[in-house]
């Protein structure tokens, strides 16, 4: 076995060699330097010493604390000569504690004794003890001392009321003694001794001095009050037997109560030092307070500390408790009293947090956060009247599905857009600008299907004029009424285009009458809505329609600033496989140029490419011009306002700030499971998990909205994930984990996803028309619903005879009155029209042969399973359960 030096041993233990040498020497191992060798016996001896020191065995040890307090009392004798009386108080306290706490207690006791005895000249000096503690243990014990001091502070505050009552009692006793002791016999020799009684208040170190008028005349005889004030024997005996007056004076001084002779109060935190019994006097007999005894006393707070708490928009329970310097459990208690079950990590809104702060007695103020969006307020976006120029009107074409909105725009643009739409219906917002002889007009084509409500509302918000297309042969339909409501809510003028006027059944007057019922009054009837009869097939009335639109635009006096940072609205957005996030935007003011930094919601980016509606690259776009931009960090939310900034760093900062803010809002909206929800959960509810991927975000929103409307109390739709772009591997893995069906709307799976679909068998459905997707999901939900179960009566059997067979049991001879009886059908036994048994047949025979069924008018024999109480005259009803599939 190789020998090990002290330095190597210290390196193995992870400590300094000097510290290890000190511990070895304390353990009795003679080692002088780090180069000395350490044997196994030395290690064992060191280990035994450390175990005894730190108490690894866990045994309990007694600690005796001996404290001695020495004080001096200066008094004058009868002749007026000063004399000093030395008083020593010894206290002995035995503590039983764990071994690991004994070192700290002993150390504190030794330090306390050394500090107290250092003041006395005759006290022996404390021998310093070598400490073998490391820094971590010292820190732990310091933390224990800090906690102990905090506990003492709290207990002192709790005793505040008791000490106040004690002070009042002492004051009352003083007043009583003043009145009762001023009795003096004539002719007797008395000595007037100036006594005073004072009480020390716990909340301050000031003492209430007794006025000189409170002089108590004491007779030579011992009164009951004197006995109470002198519970102990006199410490100083009179030395002389002289005059009676001197003897009485010496006796009064000897019988005075001194703080060192009295038993200490049991209450922790009483720092009065017994001053309420006696006030010290100077050599002239005047009372004075001993300030030296109370100058280091603990002073409990007299009033609760009121904090000023700054409340942001959202704040967690833990952070709110930290701001008020209370425990989180106290905040949770207040919220529970308000009816909110929360956790320490749950987010609270600003109003709730302010109510909680005020309930707990603090001052709540709304915080002014470090909001990066304040930079946007500094950007001058206010329109300058001198720089404003006229702009082209933005016209939204709205109406019911298949009423010819896109066909009308086709004729205006001289293109064939409707022919390229799947199913002949529009499923996106199309933005185009058309140059006419009287100016430029920007058209927005919105979907007419009822699932695209959000798209139509978005189109109504960013438009100047609404063209309401109504089919002359179909009339006013639900989406037509909805379009009228959107336009009126946005206070937008309406131009009604009555389409399909080339059909013989077209009736313009009927359309006017129907729209008047919904608040759209034509001009010739005294209203403000222009009605134009058009035909997208023949071109009838198209010029008149454009003329009406431009006339309405002139009345509105549309203006905007051109030379300014661009500002507009995201019309539509999607994820292109080759180009990344793509957004269709409509510039409302300013000029948007290639290379500008765009900020919209929590998305930002630098414009790398900009295309018009024909797919041609453009370098800039003015007001009322729709363009398609590339370069955003992710797919933007449709309907969001965008703004062009000059500082990309500031745009990134604002976007990240909004992302964090949206995250707090999402956490706040997380559903917290309540007890009533747990007990009220219904296990028979079926849930269909779906993953929706679409080509553009608007279609994704519309499909999710349409599918959510199919929910009932029995079947629910859970959209696990929705997004734009192709179906990728992560979507398939998510569907596999959540057992969801993947719906691809105008998009397909990539190569990796197709391989994963083939290997896992995940159900993926592709659609390009929203009707088909909704119908398929409706069928799936109908199949998940529990079918309707109805009873169908098959026949009625009358029991004529009863036979009891020992090996078989009770057999009934029956006659089929109505219908038929089947061997496998459930039956009911009726006695006097009351059901006495429900069950099934055990056997069915006819002429000793087992049969499956017996029809009406024939006799048969039967026995029931687990039922023998059959009587003659009973009837048996035969029925079956018919399940009918339910349809949404």
Curated annotation (Swiss-Prot):
Amino acid composition bias (Low complexity), ranges on this chain: 207-225
Gene: infB
Function: One of the essential components for the initiation of protein synthesis. Protects formylmethionyl-tRNA from spontaneous hydrolysis and promotes its binding to the 30S ribosomal subunits. Also involved in the hydrolysis of GTP during the formation of the 70S ribosomal complex.
Lineage: Bacteria, Pseudomonadati, Pseudomonadota, Betaproteobacteria, Nitrosomonadales
UniProt feature, compositional bias: Polar residues: 181-206
PANTHER family the record matches: TR-TYPE G DOMAIN-CONTAINING PROTEIN, TRANSLATION INITIATION FACTOR IF-2-RELATED
Region called G3, residue ranges: 445-448
Binding site for GTP: 399-406, 445-449, 499-502
Region ranges (Disordered): 96-122, 158-302
Residue numbers spanned by region G4: 499-502
Transmembrane regions: none
Keywords (A to Z) from UniProt: Cytoplasm, GTP-binding, Initiation factor, Nucleotide-binding, Protein biosynthesis
Segments of this protein annotated with the region G1: 399-406
Protein name in the entry: Translation initiation factor IF-2
Compositionally biased tracts (Basic and acidic residues): 98-114, 158-167, 226-243, 253-269
Family classification: Belongs to the TRAFAC class translation factor GTPase superfamily. Classic translation factor GTPase family. IF-2 subfamily.
Main location: cytoplasm
Pfam families: EF-G_D2, GTP_EFTU, IF-2, IF2_assoc, IF2_N
Domain spans labelled tr-type G: 390-559
One Gene Ontology MF term: translation initiation factor activity
Residue span of region G5: 535-537
Subcellular location: Cytoplasm
Keyword Transmembrane: no
Leader sequence residues: none
């Amino acid at each position: 076995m190789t020998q090990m030096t002290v330095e190597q041993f210290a390196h193995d233990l992870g400590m300094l060699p000097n510290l290890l040498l000190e511990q070895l020497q304390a353990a009795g191992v003679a080692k002088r330097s780090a180069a000395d060798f350490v044997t196994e016996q030395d290690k064992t001896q060191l280990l035994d010493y450390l175990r005894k020191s730190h108490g690894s065995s866990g045994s309990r040890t007694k600690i005796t604390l001996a404290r001695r307090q020495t004080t001096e009392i200066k008094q004058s004798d009868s002749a007026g000569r000063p004399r000093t009386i030395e008083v020593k108080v010894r206290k002995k306290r035995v503590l039983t504690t764990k071994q690991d706490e004994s070192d700290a207690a002993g150390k504190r006791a030794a330090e306390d004794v050394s500090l107290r005895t250092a003041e006395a000249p005759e006290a022996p000096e404390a021998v310093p003890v070598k400490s073998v503690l490391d820094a971590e243990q010292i820190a732990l014990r310091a933390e224990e001392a800090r906690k102990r001091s905090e506990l003492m502070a709290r207990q002192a505050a709790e005793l505040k009321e008791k000490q106040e009552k004690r002070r009042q009692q002492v004051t009352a006793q003083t007043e009583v003694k003043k009145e009762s002791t001023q009795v003096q016999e004539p002719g007797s020799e008395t000595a007037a001794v100036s006594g005073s009684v004072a009480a020390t208040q716990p909340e301050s170190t000031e003492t209430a001095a007794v006025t000189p008028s409170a002089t108590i005349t004491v007779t030579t005889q011992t009164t009951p009050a004197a006995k109470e004030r002198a519970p102990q024997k006199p410490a100083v005996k009179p030395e002389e037997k002289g005059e009676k007056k001197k003897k009485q004076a010496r006796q009064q001084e000897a019988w005075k109560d001194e703080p060192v002779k009295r038993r200490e109060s049991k209450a922790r935190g009483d720092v009065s030092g017994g001053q309420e019994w006696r006030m010290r006097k100077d050599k002239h007999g005047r009372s004075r307070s001993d300030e030296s005894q109370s100058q280091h006393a603990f002073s409990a707070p007299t009033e609760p500390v009121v904090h000023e708490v700054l409340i942001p928009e959202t704040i967690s329970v833990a952070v709110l408790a930290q701001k008020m310097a209370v425990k989180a459990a106290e905040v949770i208690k207040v919220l529970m009293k308000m009816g909110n079950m929360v956790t320490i990590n749950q987010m609270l809104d600003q109003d709730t947090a302010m109510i909680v702060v005020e309930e707990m007695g603090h001052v709540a103020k709304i915080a002014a956060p470090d909001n990066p969006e304040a930079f946007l307020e500094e950007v001058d976006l206010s329109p300058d009247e001198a720089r404003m120029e006229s702009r082209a009107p933005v016209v939204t074409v709205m109406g019911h599905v298949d009423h010819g909105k896109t066909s009308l725009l086709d004729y205006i643009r001289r293109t064939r857009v409707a022919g390229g739409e799947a199913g002949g219906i529009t499923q996106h917002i199309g933005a185009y600008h058309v140059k006419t002889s009287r100016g430029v007009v920007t058209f927005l084509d919105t979907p007419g299907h009822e699932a695209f409500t959000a798209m139509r509302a978005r189109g109504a918000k960013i438009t100047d004029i609404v063209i309401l297309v109504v089919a002359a042969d179909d009339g006013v339909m639900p989406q037509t009424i909805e379009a009228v409501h959107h336009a009126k809510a946005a206070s937008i003028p309406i131009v009604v285009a009555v389409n399909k006027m080339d059909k013989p059944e077209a009736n313009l007057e009927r359309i006017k009458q129907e729209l008047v019922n919904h608040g759209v009054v034509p001009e010739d009837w005294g209203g403000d809505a222009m009605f134009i009869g058009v035909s997208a097939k023949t071109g009838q009335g198209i010029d008149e329609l454009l003329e009406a639109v431009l006339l309405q635009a002139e009345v509105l006096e549309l203006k905007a600033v051109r030379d300014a940072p661009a500002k507009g609205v995201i019309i539509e957005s999607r994820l292109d496989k080759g180009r990344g996030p793509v957004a269709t935007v409509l510039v409302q003011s300013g000029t948007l140029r290639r290379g500008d930094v765009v900020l919209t919601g929590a998305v930002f980016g630098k414009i790398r490419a900009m295309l018009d509606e024909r797919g041609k690259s453009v370098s800039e776009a003015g007001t009322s011009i729709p363009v398609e931009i590339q370069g955003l960090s992710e797919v933007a939310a449709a309907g969001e306002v965008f703004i062009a900034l000059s500082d990309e760093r500031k745009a990134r900062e604002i976007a990240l700030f909004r992302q964090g803010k949206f995250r707090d809002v999402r956490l706040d909206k997380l559903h917290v499971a309540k007890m009533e929800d747990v007990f009220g959960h219904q296990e028979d509810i079926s849930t269909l998990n779906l993953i929706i991927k679409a080509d553009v975000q608007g279609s994704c929103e519309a499909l999710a909205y349409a599918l959510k409307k199919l929910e009932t109390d029995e079947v629910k739709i859970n959209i696990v994930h929705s997004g734009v772009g192709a179906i990728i591997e992560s979507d398939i893995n998510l569907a596999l984990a959540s057992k969801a069906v993947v719906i691809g709307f105008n998009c397909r799976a990539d190569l990796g996803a197709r391989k994963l679909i083939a290997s896992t068998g995940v159900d993926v459905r592709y659609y390009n028309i929203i009707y088909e997707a909704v119908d398929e999901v409706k069928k799936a939900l109908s199949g998940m619903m529990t079918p309707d179960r109805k009873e169908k009566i098959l026949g009625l059997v009358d029991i004529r005879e009863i036979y009891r067979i020992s090996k078989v049991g009770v057999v009934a001879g029956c006659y089929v009155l109505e219908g038929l009886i089947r061997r496998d059908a459930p039956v009911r036994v009726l006695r006097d029209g009351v059901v006495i048994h429900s069950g099934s047949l055990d056997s069915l025979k006819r002429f000793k042969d087992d049969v499956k069924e017996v029809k009406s008018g024939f006799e048969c024999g039967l026995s029931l399973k687990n039922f023998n109480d059959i009587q003659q005259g009973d009837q048996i009803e035969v029925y079956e359960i018919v399940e009918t599939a339910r349809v949404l």
